[in-house]
């Protein structure tokens, strides 16, 4: 397809600043500037917004890294890296931030440029960064193994972000589900002001695209979910199954402040990509996974309404936590010993040991529930009373006693049902697949594809 061209992948992560800015905004600037600098450039995928392990305590704000995939006339990797570094420097200079201030802040940005030949070998980096702990030292060893002729790391931007940068590049090597997100950016002079998005237009957009978009509004609370809330460049973001339906938002959703630019990203958001099958014995702190366990204890209520319950499989036992903000605690409180559930989540350290934080769960089997009471005395018909554990029952009226009588039991209908229990849209994290996406999964991405810059992104305000 690209005779005499070389394919390159640019990965970047942790370019957010606390006061403003985000890695996707940097990527938008980078896309346009690369197109200006290299006339032969062809974009062979939408920029990838790759969400990584949500359990990691030192994760970035949205825990999302970016990969840009291009074909162009062959050049030295260092030439492309230097161009990317200079463009990012220019981006920060536009906002009055010096490069040394970026790398000396609480952020640790990372930037890598990769030749296409080794990308298939980088899939394991993505899987580990998505589901486990991947340390920068391990990534650096891998990079050294690949060789500088295949991958180069920025000397200006070589912080912890190289983990996400390398992992985002590796995503393309894994056949997996994906979605798209259109991010619309605001003018810098409006960063300190409340976002001005017409809610009725969002509801209308949702009503005519709901079969191809998701998480636009939360019906129960009547809350709009597409707007960002921090001091950052994002005005709103809409998520869906294909780019064409997302572009309709630009014509339908009304805003009362300037739009500076927009970009469409292909992403692993809303796919449950991190929920890989695991046994209980394979769980470790900060690992993500999906486990199938039998409940072994009655629910207990912890601080803040958190429901704590124990479960086991053939390999071991684990404590599970269901939190109030996810609204799963109300359903978990109905579980009893013997129930079988499948739970997605991640492991966090507690003072009682590792605890599996449940993000969603399915009830696969319900144990029968009975309410039992002591039998009546066969002589005087008064109900027997229990004398203590292992001591049997006694009639207080006539003195009759029995060690192990048949109890009078009645079947109690369970309040919980078989099926999936998932948080409402307002409580969903980036990677969790919403109910609307079940049955719409994709299993392979057509790659490479040829895209014009105008299909991916557009700048409407020259200040970006």
Curated annotation (Swiss-Prot):
Gene Ontology, cellular component aspect: cytoplasm
Catalytic reaction list: cytidine(34) in tRNA(Ile2) + agmatine + ATP + H2O = 2-agmatinylcytidine(34) in tRNA(Ile2) + AMP + 2 phosphate + 2 H(+)
GO-annotated molecular function: ATP binding; ligase activity, forming carbon-nitrogen bonds
InterPro entries: TiaS-like_TCKD, TiaS_FLD, tRNA_Ile2__agm2C_synt, Zn_ribbon_TiaS
Keywords assigned: ATP-binding, Cytoplasm, Ligase, Nucleotide-binding, tRNA processing
EC number, as in UniProt: 6.3.4.22
Protein location: Cytoplasm
GO biological processes: tRNA wobble cytosine modification
Family label: Belongs to the TiaS family.
Biological role stated in the UniProt entry: ATP-dependent agmatine transferase that catalyzes the formation of 2-agmatinylcytidine (agm2C) at the wobble position (C34) of tRNA(Ile2), converting the codon specificity from AUG to AUA.
Protein name (record): tRNA(Ile2) 2-agmatinylcytidine synthetase TiaS
